[in-house]
């Protein structure tokens, strides 16, 4: 009987967490965290939001915003940006850390940055020449992929 109760409790817990996981819902712009709204208003003031959603995965909340021109931004639960991707243009000035911009301008003249992904341990940028550069949190180049 004890094993049955443990099994039943485990199944119930698994069911609840599975139902809670992957709980995405569309939201309005004003439902984004304040920091996310400020980021969008600062760097993309003339862009029209096509779609915004809140993503809930177990204990983590994140947000995704897509603009009508295919620019996509992902935000952490606190509103800090995690990823910015400009499919048909380059990133606005001020998003990419200056050290990375200087490295790209010095080593890849005439090439622009169209995407940036900020992780816990590194920052990855995608260049218009097809290269992806990965920097540590001190902005030292640690990897390059084509």
For each predicted feature, which ranges?
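Bacterial Sec-dependent N-terminal signal peptides
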Residues: 1-24
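Interaction-mediating elements
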Residues: 22-146
């Amino acid at each position: 009987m004890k094993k049955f109760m443990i099994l039943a409790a485990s199944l119930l817990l698994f069911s609840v967490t599975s139902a809670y996981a992957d709980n995405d819902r569309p939201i309005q712009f004003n439902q984004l965290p304040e920091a996310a709204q400020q980021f969008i208003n600062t760097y993309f003031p003339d862009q029209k939001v096509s779609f915004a959603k809140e993503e809930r995965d177990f204990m983590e909340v994140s947000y995704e915003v897509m603009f009508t021109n295919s620019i996509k931004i992902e935000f952490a639960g606190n509103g800090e940006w995690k990823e910015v991707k400009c499919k048909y243009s380059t990133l606005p000035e001020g998003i990419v850390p200056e050290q990375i911009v200087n490295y790209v301008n010095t080593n890849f003249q005439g090439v622009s940055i169209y995407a940036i992904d900020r992780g816990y341990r590194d920052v990855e940028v995608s260049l218009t020449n097809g290269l992806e550069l990965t920097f540590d949190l001190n902005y030292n180049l640690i990897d390059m992929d084509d």
